[in-house]
């Protein structure tokens, strides 16, 4: 469809016989465009499509000298200025005295005394002629409801603002503000204070610039506005464009795979104008709900109750997203303003569901930026945590929007802020370069988590890998040890955020080519083991798997919602037997990465697509699973996957995978068997292994960690696997052999009410039934005893020496008597 709005830099020709004064020539209609074809009745508007430029030259000569017609010719951009559309207007429309630009003079305190937004509903700067552009040709693609005014107006959401409830539905805490003039500390202090949950503020120094917003839907007239900032989220297949002005937001979502969507937000007294199929006397705004206390929302998309009804329902839903009152006390951008809705939908299984899914996510991102911009403008400042929160979640959800929602795994995803949007963000990037990373690594869990958030948000993927890999690994290890030694682990938002960010950054580092790629692969395999160990049956029973339940709980609470509240170690694990089928796993599956390697999608059962590290991650971090094409192990739904060594993995399944060294666990319900396969990279043969019964050596009397790297597996005769725990250091090993005296409840058999058995899986492929640990009696002498003994021996020797010396030095007095006769 050619562009028909005259403000789009199109070449146009307006000729009238009155202006040219050329004589009327009686010649045949060589171009086939007779006078009656263009407009036989004086004073009427008509048009003709697909007109050749030669026809225009003919008409130029044919029009009468003092006629009352004016015609306009618009080239089709694809025709190289040879063909286009011609319109014939009555001349009277261009001599009306109505001014072209009329602003609404209504007073509005947040916007000044003159509206910052007003429509340019005119033709050649004359609004009188706008009524002529109401033909079917201009809206043949049916962008809006056309036959029923009931479809034109949307019901307002009960959670948005009204005159009686100007703050709408409250789910966020009060916004903090600077006590004095908003200031920003130095670079280093900026990050340290943020990580320590102390506020810094930026002043709102954005500049306004006059601009014109050109809607993607050409039926809507352009809007004059005061431009502030904007954002693009784009790939080779998709573009999300957000334009922010004073009291104005323009949002558009365009893709080669899905129908377009556009949202326009204006001050509540601004009447946008559009071309419709109704008669010119019925002037309508674009579709949308009624205005709120400050803003009016318009939604444009392809759908109504009769045509594309599912998308029309989506349009009505997202019309309630832009808040109709700037929440100076309750900013909706905290915690991502869009994550609550994001978690309320399972991953769609069809095209209509996917369209609604990505439309809602992208709209939430746009309205979050608009809300922050308005609150920032009205208050004169922005808190650093508000800006970081928005940027972090925008980057996070952009991956879902473009990569997962659009099935666009191969194209890079880009986020571009323009004009005033980079104010403050440059300062944050500079601050990251001055921080002492070693100092942060020794901080508290919340300090390290917020630092990882900054790294993810404001650095490149290459730099992310270098700065975050070791820190991420340490965080995962600390959380794993805490879960081992604590009977009740408090998985609060901080712990979930730290685990999520650590998992995500390790994942990114392993999926890009960098100097630490191999180190990242090793860290990722260890991450799998530790998260699988943390995903016990007891923990899984406490996870809120249902997104709808999470949203329901949110509506009943006044606390701030965070996307991390729905995260769990199970979502970053390779444990598949205790997960729930709800869609929350699908929601988290698309988060971590910004660009993917160009690889073929591994052939894994569709039931495993919804775990955060499956499909893309299993192929990257555990390639030995897919090193034998065509083997059935590539197509099974496993119980668990344990990357236990270098290029070696234990695969636990219910069916024989026909690959690797196979161990069949005895004493298990025949309907629910446990088969353990030890897989090596490139080895596709089959061997039968034997699980060895017996006692193991007690490692208490040695400093060497005999069982580090092994996996402790507790199971029941029913086939249920209770625990899969990694032995990762000497302290955990000693707890393992302590038995009933172990402070780790998973190692203590008295903690289990029903009988269970234990296997120990070694990194070399050996599996042993754990019966007991054999203790050998060893006489141990303390160092004090040894030194005392040495001293005693020395003293005894000294005494003996003295005695001998005395005996040897003694001379007897022997006297002889001469015997005489």
Swiss-Prot record:
Main location as per UniProt: virion
Any one of the GO CC terms: membrane
Lineage: Viruses, Duplodnaviria, Heunggongvirae, Peploviricota, Herviviricetes
Membrane topology of this protein: Single-pass type I membrane protein
Keywords on record: Fusion of virus membrane with host cell membrane, Fusion of virus membrane with host membrane, Glycoprotein, Host cell membrane, Host endosome, Host membrane, Membrane, Sialic acid, Signal, Transmembrane, Transmembrane helix, Viral envelope protein, Viral penetration into host cytoplasm, Virion, Virus entry into host cell
Topology Virion surface: residue spans: 21-783
TM annotation in the entry: 784-804
Intravirion face of the membrane: 805-821
Protein purpose: The heterodimer glycoprotein H-glycoprotein L is required for the fusion of viral and plasma membranes leading to virus entry into the host cell. Following initial binding to host receptor, membrane fusion is mediated by the fusion machinery composed of gB and the heterodimer gH/gL. May also be involved in the fusion between the virion envelope and the outer nuclear membrane during virion morphogenesis.
Modification after translation (UniProt): N-glycosylated, O-glycosylated, and sialylated.
Annotated signal sequence range: 1-20
Name this protein carries in UniProt: Envelope glycoprotein H
Superkingdom to which the source organism belongs: Viruses
